[in-house]
């Protein structure tokens, strides 16, 4: 069973690629035709590849590991933030800081600083400092939150990345590849699919196309996590039933008179 309907993809404009003169020849296998100077993506191939990608994401999500959502372009950032939060996953929707993956220990220090400022507001520290100092701390926290808020709870590098627009997120791609982290991505006709482990040929500029794909990824993760919880509950119930069942004592032999 497919995660998508062809009609939904058509309505969302998933099939519209870039101008033919801006294409990447490596995307030729995923292009159906050229129309009015624009490449049209072969949605039959998108259906198959999207299903493969979502099946792989489902398997990762069931292990309990995290999948980072990445999309900082204007059309994607709000969608990325909303869907990643719904799925309980880390995300980057503002600027990608160099070293977010390859120098994660340093990034964690900035996250701890942000959390420390939060504690100051609740433990009474704010009452002991000047108004100017409170203002400076507030600005510092706001800046950290804008950039790092989406990964504030992340304690280790993610198991995979899902990316919208691999040309724009080239630093994230480079870092993930250097660490061997699987990359799932919407790949438009002007991109190099060889940089991605799981290619989803799709329009990465139209809001409706982005929404359709990102929502499907989030839905897959939510369902996989729910299944994992259900399986864990059933396993505990089976374990409890097994421990409560007491073996019957064998009948004592009658003594001979």
From Swiss-Prot:
Gene Ontology cellular-component annotations: cytosolic small ribosomal subunit
InterPro entries noted in UniProt: Ribosomal_uS2, Ribosomal_uS2_bac/mit/plastid, Ribosomal_uS2_CS, Ribosomal_uS2_flav_dom_sf
Keyword Transmembrane annotated: no
Region called Disordered, residue ranges: 237-257
Gene3D superfamilies: Glucose-6-phosphate isomerase like protein, domain 1, Helix hairpin bin
GO biological process: translation
Record GO terms (molecular function): structural constituent of ribosome
Pfam families in UniProt: Ribosomal_S2
Skewed-composition ranges (Acidic residues): 240-257
Keywords tagged on the record: Ribonucleoprotein, Ribosomal protein
Top-level taxon of origin: Bacteria
SUPFAM superfamilies, sorted: Ribosomal protein S2
Family, per entry: Belongs to the universal ribosomal protein uS2 family.
HAMAP family: Ribosomal_uS2_B (MF_00291_B)
Name the UniProt record assigns to this protein: Small ribosomal subunit protein uS2
Species name: Chlorobium phaeovibrioides (strain DSM 265 / 1930)
